[in-house]
């Protein structure tokens, strides 16, 4: 019940507020009409009997703001209680504001005091009849602007009408022309007076609050921002902004640190670049200095070599070789040692292949040993071994002095320098050749000259020994190793400038220890022979290696003193 009564009271207050607003607008319309005709005399009086008898002057029954919804203002933005802050009558309000008429016109307050039932506003009409506007006529008028004159010596009030509402009057069935020629009475009730009394008292520049709804809306919008939900949202937004601000500060610090690190890195890079530039300059200086030293050393070596070797220039003769002369000498001595060992191993394999029942082969070997008063038996001694070794070495090293290892052979290249380089290149390519590679592809695949050399030496050995049996694989492998070492030794010897020479000695030559090595000296020494030694047989040849001599191995005979 209480809630329903509250709703009814609110609705009633709203309706009263709307009615008060309509009445106030009607009053303003009448005052504005008075302002539009300044030449005529304005009078406020009670309605006469003739005007009361006119049909148009009769008050319209039960007219209210609900009959004119177009002019019903909306007061949602204003509290309803604002219309009741001061309960004054229209006459009191006008008395307080000092609004009156001069020049013989009666005061507006006196006119309102004499009226008992209805209060009317009498206004002059164009046909010199007084036209009375009632509140019903005011409802047909549009909203008006109210203002007063600024003259201090004149108490008259100026009013101006803005527009009309003919469209709405036609819909209601009223004749506008008849209304212009008739006197209409607007009833002014106490509620109307209350509306009029609610006007502000300040003079000059007074503005109604309902004329400026934007101000109210602005106040309302300001109140919206003060609501708790908006406050919470603003707090959240402020927190978010604060967090974002801290994040931005953190990013700024990180950016500053990154910039500092970058500057430091750039500084280090610049320092390193400058250091590298200095090092490159020093390196170029050292390279040029080393080149000058090498050139000076080469020239000095050439001069010394010419003085020591009688015009042979060791620096010039090996200047174009990929390795130095010392390396070549060491390699040559190593190949000589390998060749001697490989020939001994081949001889052992050959002797192991001899069959004692093969009388033809044994007879051929005895024929070779007969000049030395020796014969081949199963229990042969070292002397027989040395003699057989001498026979094999003589066959293998035959024609070693020739440039192509052949009797009366001719060089392939006429330019000695190019020939030396070709010999060394062939030496390097065949140095690591193995027996398994030869079994797969043959010696001719790797070198035609080496293949021809192997065929010639094998044929010479077979012819010398009158060998009639086929060679076994083991014997062939031993022969390949021996032939390879001798061939490499020849290639390397002819890679020098001039080529290294072979040292051979003939039989019955006087023994010279500087060039010969007696392999049977211990046995002869045990025989206490003191006579001059003579070469019996050369077992292994020697070589002339530049300014040195690699002695040959021989067997000597000694004559006893008796």
Swiss-Prot record:
InterPro entries: GIL1_IRKI_C (IPR056813), IRKI-like (IPR042316)
Induction section of the entry: By auxin.
Residue spans of biased composition, Low complexity class: 36-61
UniProtKB keywords: Coiled coil
Disruption outcome: No visible phenotype under normal growth conditions.
Coiled-coil ranges per UniProt: 246-306
Region Disordered, residue ranges: 29-61, 303-322
One Pfam family hit: GIL1_IRKI_C
Recorded superkingdom: Eukaryota
Name recorded for this polypeptide: IRK-interacting protein
Species name: Arabidopsis thaliana (Mouse-ear cress)
């Amino acid at each position: 019940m209480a809630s329903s009564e509250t709703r009814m009271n609110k609705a009633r207050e709203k309706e009263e507020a709307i009615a008060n607003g309509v009445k106030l607008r009607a009053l303003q319309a009448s005052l504005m009409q008075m302002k539009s005709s300044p030449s005529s005399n304005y009078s406020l009086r009670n309605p006469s009997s003739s005007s009361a008898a006119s049909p148009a002057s009769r008050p319209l029954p039960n007219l209210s703001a609900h009959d004119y919804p177009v002019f019903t203002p909306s007061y949602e933005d204003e509290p309803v209680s604002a219309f009741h802050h001061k309960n004054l009558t229209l006459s009191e309000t006008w008395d307080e504001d000092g609004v009156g008429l001069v020049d013989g016109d009666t005061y507006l307050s006196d006119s309102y005091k004499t009226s008992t039932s209805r209060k009317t506003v009498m206004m002059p009409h164009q046909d010199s009849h007084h036209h009375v506007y009632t509140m019903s006529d005011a409802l047909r008028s549009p909203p008006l602007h109210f203002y007063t004159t600024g003259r201090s010596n004149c108490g008259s009030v100026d009013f101006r009408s803005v527009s009309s509402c003919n469209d709405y009057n036609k819909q209601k069935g009223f004749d506008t022309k008849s209304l212009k020629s008739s006197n209409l009475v607007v009833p002014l009730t106490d509620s109307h007076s209350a509306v009029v009394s609610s006007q502000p008292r300040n003079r000059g520049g007074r503005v109604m609050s309902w004329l400026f709804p934007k101000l109210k809306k602005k106040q309302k919008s300001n109140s919206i921002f003060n609501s708790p939900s908006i406050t919470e949202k603003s707090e959240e937004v402020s927190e978010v902004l604060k967090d974002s601000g801290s994040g931005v500060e953190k990013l700024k610090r990180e950016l500053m640190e990154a910039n500092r690190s970058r500057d430091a890195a750039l500084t280090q890079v610049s320092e390193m670049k400058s250091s590298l530039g200095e090092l490159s300059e020093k390196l170029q200086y050292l390279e040029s200095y080393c080149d000058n030293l090498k050139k000076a050393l080469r020239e000095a070596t050439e001069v010394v070599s010419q003085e020591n070797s009688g015009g042979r220039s060791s620096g010039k003769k090996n200047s174009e070789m990929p390795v130095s002369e010392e390396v070549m000498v060491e390699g040559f001595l190593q190949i000589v040692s390998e060749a001697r060992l490989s020939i001994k191993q081949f001889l052992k394999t050959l002797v192991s292949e001899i069959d004692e029942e093969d009388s033809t082969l044994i007879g051929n070997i005895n024929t070779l040993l007969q000049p030395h008063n020796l014969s081949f038996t199963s229990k042969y001694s070292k002397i027989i071994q040395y003699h057989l070794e001498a026979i094999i070495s003589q066959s293998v090293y035959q024609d070693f002095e020739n440039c192509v290892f052949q009797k009366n052979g001719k060089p392939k290249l006429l330019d000695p320098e190019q020939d030396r380089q070709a010999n060394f290149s062939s030496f390097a390519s065949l140095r690591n050749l193995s027996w398994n590679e030869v079994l797969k592809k043959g010696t001719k695949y790797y070198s035609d000259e080496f293949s021809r050399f192997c065929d010639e030496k094998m044929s010479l050995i077979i012819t010398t020994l009158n060998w009639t049996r086929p060679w076994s694989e083991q014997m062939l492998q031993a022969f390949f190793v021996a032939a390879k070492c001798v061939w490499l030794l020849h290639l390397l010897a002819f890679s020098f400038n001039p080529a290294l020479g072979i040292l051979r000695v003939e039989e019955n030559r006087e023994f010279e220890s500087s060039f010969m090595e007696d392999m049977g000296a211990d046995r002869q020494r045990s025989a206490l022979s003191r006579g001059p030694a003579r070469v019996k047989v050369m077992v292994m040849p020697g070589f002339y290696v530049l300014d040195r001599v690699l002695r040959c191995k021989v067997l000597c005979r000694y004559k006893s003193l008796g």
